[in-house]
Amino acid sequence: MEDGSHCLKFFTIGLFCLSLVSAHRVHEYDKHPLSKFNVYKTTLGFRDSVIITANPLILGSKGEDTAWVTVDLVNPDPSDDDWVAVYSPANFNSSTCSVENDEFQSPYLCTSPIKYKYANFSNANYNQTGNNTLNFQLINQRADFSFALFSGGLSNPVLVAVSNVITFSNPKAPLYARLAHGKLWNEMTVTWTSGYSIDEAVPFVEWGLKGEEPRTRSPAGTLTVEQNSMCGAPARTVGWHDLGFTHTSFLTNLWPNTVYSYRMGHILSNGSYVWGKNYTFKSSPYPGQDSLQRVIIFGDMGKGERDGSNEYSSKDPGALNTTDQLIKDLPNYDIVFHIGDISYADGYVADWDQFTAQVEPIASTVPYMVASGNHERDWPNSGSFYENTDSGGECGVLAETMFYFPAENRAKFWYSTDYGMFHFCIADSEHDWREGTEQYKFIEHCLASADRRKQPWLIFAAHRVLGYSSNSWYAQEGSFEEPMGRESLQKLWQKYRVDIAFYGHVHNYERTCPIYQNQCVNSGKSHYSGTVKGTIHVVVGGGGCHLSEFTTAIPNWSIYRDYDWGFVKLTAFNRSSLLFEYKKSRDGKVYDSFTISREYKDVLACVHDSCEPTTLAS
């Protein structure tokens, strides 16, 4: 996402530092909604006359990981500023505060809720009657829940009453499966979350060919995140939430294009088993295999609230549109790339649970590959290229833990992966990419390693716009790109004949002509045949976060722009034919498209600084 300054730290030979500040402003909707709650100023004003009750007491009795809860309010002294917060764990008073949260005078509260609604939600008569019934949707987050009624609004909160405690029947259950490619083409990883430490239960995945026996059991590794591994507030303070245990298992030696079934399990110390849901996935085709292959790409989605909790209505208003459209279209694609700004937790750590629950129908069925964005990584003095606070103190730790990706070093969020006729080079725009850096060397090696006879479709992706965008603040800066974005990389895109480069960060959709050094090198708009001559750059940051304005002047390289939420679908029919489609999330219809038709000799053709050395010697 675009908020936070574009304050960029880089080093020259003399270790000279320069900060670049963008022209755009941080808007109110850029802030995490929970940041509006002045936690430390909370005072106590318990009233015996106020009643707040939650039902049912036990959730998920049939194994569900999501449940609806009814909260009834009776308040003899209601006001417009009353609001109801959801807390988990249920005990949220000062006894749970860490030393780092302590101020000169210890506050009563030191943690933010998971979400909230105003007490008059959907009932205009609350201010007169003091009675209302609120419905909340909860997910299993490994702890019990309570509901708190506050008066005084978000800035001067007064805690008035706390409800009874409710809980899921098994808070520790294995949940929220998410698939990703391993480092080998015939390897799939399964990552999930549970409340079981390795001291009390052994995690594994049971899997095999769908409908066949015997089944294989593969062990899982387990990672945890501690509060002191966060780099700053709010992740390290009021936004902290225990994420339990993250398990990852590697399913190896898969047959290509084959359907498998799987389920996560834990063996308890008494020998009994706890099982997760049953899922299926289709393994990847062999690199270069000629078959129908379909890819989804987008960025900047975030999370939504299906119960109408109003704090997310302006921050990530399109998140559920995109999620629901992808769930609906699930049989018609094979892999997803979410290229940065994943959950927009921004240091309110419980959002990571809620995001993995939101995308679970997708991520449990097809590989869900992620990239790093500013809202995952950026934090001052933490090694990020940009010296801003957009990650809310997470400094990359949570994204690196919650999702698997086949990088050599998870703290350096760049990697390559294959899917049949596609070769993907995923860059990390939150680390230095310029010539001479470690990442630049990776990018060149990744692009150079593509066997274009077998894998003709070469795709580059990064979160920030390292190519072209006519977004309003880039236009104000006069760059139409992230500062220094394409300066080093465009010669690599041209040399290795990258077909399409994708970016997020800017919350809209835009497609360029095939371009090199700011000049269109092909006059086509809807169909390209033979030698394309340049890379097509696509901004696809309309995954769900609030939208970004375009500049009013349209550059000559901008073919199509759309101020809406959406995603891109690539379909490779064979090694000679590729279909590109941009779909709106609201209806799933195609609003922009083009095709590429070519042969292997067209990829080899000498054009614009992509010519191999030759000799006249016989």
Predicted regions: what is each one?
Residues 2-7, 12-170, 308-313:
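Extended, solvent-exposed regions of the mature portions of secreted/cell-surface glycoproteins
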Residues 53-58, 68-72, 120-122, 131-136, ...:
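Eukaryotic intrinsically disordered and solvent-exposed regulatory patches
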Residues 169-539, 543-550, 559-561, 569-617:
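Metal-dependent phosphoester/phosphodiester hydrolase catalytic core
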Residues 564:
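Substrate-binding and catalytic surfaces of secreted/luminal carbohydrate-active proteins
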